[in-house]
Amino acid sequence: MKLSIIIIATSLVIAVVAFPSKDSKAIENDKTEQRMEIVVQETARACSKQIGDKRKRNCECCGKTVVCGTIYVGGKEVNQCMDKTSDNAILNGLGKGMNFIENTFSFCV
């Protein structure tokens, strides 16, 4: 008799521990959705700079093939919006295509 009570009690304890409640899963999913919304809201920005203007972020550069670039002037790093990627016309065309793809998949407005 005592053995059967111990077996039943052990089975109930295992069942309670093994199967978490449905409420805790819902709370966990809500937190994930909230984090995803915050990330999307923080990344979208509008452009305000033209080619050659100094910038801090890629989203500040306006244009479908314009991206932020880094050049060195007198050993000092300067970040600016640029369109041209090479002096070679073929490589420059490929570079503009890559810039277009990069801007297409960014969250910039």
Curated annotation (Swiss-Prot):
Expressed by the venom gland. Keywords: Disulfide bond, Ion channel impairing toxin, Knottin, Secreted, Signal, Toxin. Disulfide bonds join 47-62, 59-108, 61-81. Putative ion channel inhibitor. Belongs to the neurotoxin 25 family. F7 subfamily. The presence of a 'disulfide through disulfide knot' structurally defines this protein as a knottin. It comes from Cyriopagopus hainanus. Residues 19-46 form a propeptide. GO terms for cellular component: extracellular region. This is Hainantoxin-XVIII-2. GO terms for molecular function: ion channel regulator activity; toxin activity. Residues 1-18 form the signal peptide. It is found in: Secreted.
